[in-house]
């Protein structure tokens, strides 16, 4: 994520927009798998694999030509009498990602609302839409902090920690077919954002550090439960199923920490 901030020029908000778009595409497609059971990838950057490839490609290109994303693509073009518009490569990159995310979100919500039987059994439309709450929360936080405090590396790190914590929780719930605590996850981000909003730069470091600690704790907890779920001797053990398939009784075990 820091590659995007450092590589998208002096305007750090484009780096944060780059992060939000890539993460939102990953979140929306994982959300679709949780509420529907399948993932349908449109063309663009909604595929998580494509998003990761894009991050790596950005890193490689910027390592060779750090200023390449500052190149002018459109210079002073007026559309239908509007004010002249100038676009750089970084603007085109982020805007194309944002368009893909928006179209994917509209498509998924349309299918949930209009196609009977699209949602999993016991999954209501209201519940499915509520699972998008962390996505909206992080985007609103990013917008508010950028307007109030401007781009800053620690703001970027804190937002990235919130984004990755919510996507990790969503993935865990998708794997275990558990209820996603969307409201709890969203509300847990608010105190840090409010602290930065009120206290300013003094709260940026705690906001970033606490976010990373929460993410690390959840990740380690996830690894511990994954070891039990797979029947492994330990986190470094080679996986061997006791039968030719996973232990069916173990698959029915509840994971209490969720």
Where are the model-predicted features located?
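Multi-pass membrane catalytic core of lipid/isoprenoid biosynthesis enzymes
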Residues: 1-24
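C-terminal membrane-associated helical module and adjoining short loops/tails
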Residues: 23-258
């Amino acid at each position: 994520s820091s590659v995007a901030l450092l590589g998208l020029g002096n305007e750090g908000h484009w780096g944060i927009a780059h992060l939000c778009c890539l993460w939102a595409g990953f979140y929306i497609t994982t959300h679709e798998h949780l509420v529907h059971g399948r993932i349908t990838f449109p063309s663009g950057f909604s595929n998580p694999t494509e998003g990761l490839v894009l991050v790596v490609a950005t890193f490689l290109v910027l390592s060779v030509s750090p200023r390449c994303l500052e190149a002018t693509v459109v210079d002073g073009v007026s559309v239908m009498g509007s004010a002249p518009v100038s676009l750089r490569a970084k603007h085109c990159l982020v805007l194309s990602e944002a368009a893909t995310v928006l179209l994917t979100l509209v498509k998924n919500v349309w299918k949930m609302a209009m196609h009977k039987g699209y949602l999993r059994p016991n999954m209501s439309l209201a519940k499915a839409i509520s699972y998008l709450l962390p996505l909206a929360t992080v985007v609103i936080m990013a917008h508010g902090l950028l307007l109030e405090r401007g781009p800053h590396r620690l703001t970027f790190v804190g937002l990235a920690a919130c984004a990755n914590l919510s996507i990790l929780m969503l993935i865990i719930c998708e794997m275990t077919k558990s209820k996603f605590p969307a409201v709890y996850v969203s509300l847990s981000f608010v105190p840090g954002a409010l602290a930065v909003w009120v206290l300013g730069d003094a709260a940026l470091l705690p906001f970033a550090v606490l976010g990373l600690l929460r993410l690390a704790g959840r990740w380690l907890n996830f690894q511990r439960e994954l070891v039990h779920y797979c029947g492994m001797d330990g986190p470094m053990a080679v996986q061997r199923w006791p039968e030719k398939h996973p232990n069916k009784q173990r698959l029915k075990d509840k994971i209490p920490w969720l």
